[in-house]
Design a protein with these regions (language model features):
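Residue-level detector of intrinsically disordered/flexible regions characterized by low predicted structural confidence
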Residues: 4-5, 163
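Hydrophobic h-region of N-terminal signal peptides that target proteins for export
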Residues: 5, 9-17
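Cysteine endopeptidase catalytic domains of the caspase/legumain-like
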Residues: 18-284
Length: 284
């Protein structure tokens, strides 16, 4: 009898640590008003494409958290990461997706060679400093790195973390009259004066990072047949959704490059940064 209960207990223990796929999708298209300095884009349209892509690759809808427009304040994004960290388990696959504006902001800890952090622009972030605003609502890569390190501790070495950024940190923030679609990003940097930065070693890569374009390029949106716009990176992943389970991670860059440049018809170089284990499948 004791042996039987031991086997039963072992069975339920194995079930309890079974790996799952979890995701957080953030999509911002409309920022509060013109005083915030951000023109309308269509990051909120990306949510349905990202979610469809994930479900096609084994993510349960109940394990996909979404924040749209006003739901995506800096506080709400932080709370969503806390929920993700709290529920993540050993060997889980965790996917994080941001579609919205991006901006370079003065680096405070010395880990960036050019002196600027890349930041996601939360719904309540301003484009320029004011006497009362110093970038508190920008989601800097330092903050993101802190959350991701906590996630890494939860999923451990064999877990998978994928971070997708369909934003732009160097593109113009206004509509280009020569382009049929808007461009995501801010032309101006968020400059904090009087900052002395300590030197800090650059971080090692502990997760798969996928960005829509190189730092010196613009992230152009794709116009759909119904006239709506969406992120070129998001839509490329959506188009590739049925193949992602069989794509080795280090093959993804070439496939995204080909797909995105067919969508936007202008040079745009998606970036895929990989940890050492780059010959594994993206979602497995």
């Amino acid at each position: 009898m004791k042996r039987l209960w031991f086997i039963v207990g072992l069975f339920f223990c194995c079930i309890s640590v079974q790996a799952e796929k979890r995701a957080l999708i953030i999509g911002i298209g409309t920022y509060p008003d013109v005083d915030y300095g951000w023109p309308v884009i269509h990051g909120d349209n990306d949510i349905v494409f990202a979610k469809t892509m994930l479900v096609a690759n084994g993510f349960k809808a109940g394990n996909i958290d979404t924040l749209r427009n006003e739901q995506a304040s800096s506080h709400a994004i932080g709370e969503a990461f806390k929920r993700l960290i709290a529920t993540a388990k050993t060997n889980d696959v965790v996917y994080i997706h941001f579609s919205g504006h991006g901006q370079q902001i003065t680096d405070l800890d010395g880990d960036e060679e050019d002196g600027y952090d890349e930041a996601w622009v939360a719904y309540d972030a301003l484009q320029e400093p004011t006497p009362n605003y110093h970038g508190e609502h920008h989601i800097t890569d330092d903050q993101l790195n802190a959350w991701l390190k906590q996630l890494r501790q939860k999923v451990e070495i064999n877990g998978r973390i994928i971070v997708v950024s369909d934003a732009c940190h160097s593109g113009t923030s206004t509509r280009d009259i020569t382009e049929p679609t808007e461009i995501r990003g801010a032309h101006s940097k968020f400059e904090l004066n009087g900052i002395k930065r300590p030197y800090k070693e650059q971080r090692t890569i502990e997760w798969i990072s996928i960005s829509a374009c190189a730092d010196n390029e613009c992230n152009r949106q794709h116009r759909l047949s119904d006239g709506k716009q969406c992120g070129s990176l998001t839509y490329a992943l959506y188009l590739l959704r049925d193949n992602l389970s069989t794509i080795v991670a280090d093959q993804l860059s070439a496939l995204l490059n080909k797909t995105i440049n067919e969508l936007v018809k202008r040079p745009q170089t998606p970036l895929v940064e990989l940890p050492n284990a780059n010959n594994q499948y993206l979602f497995e």
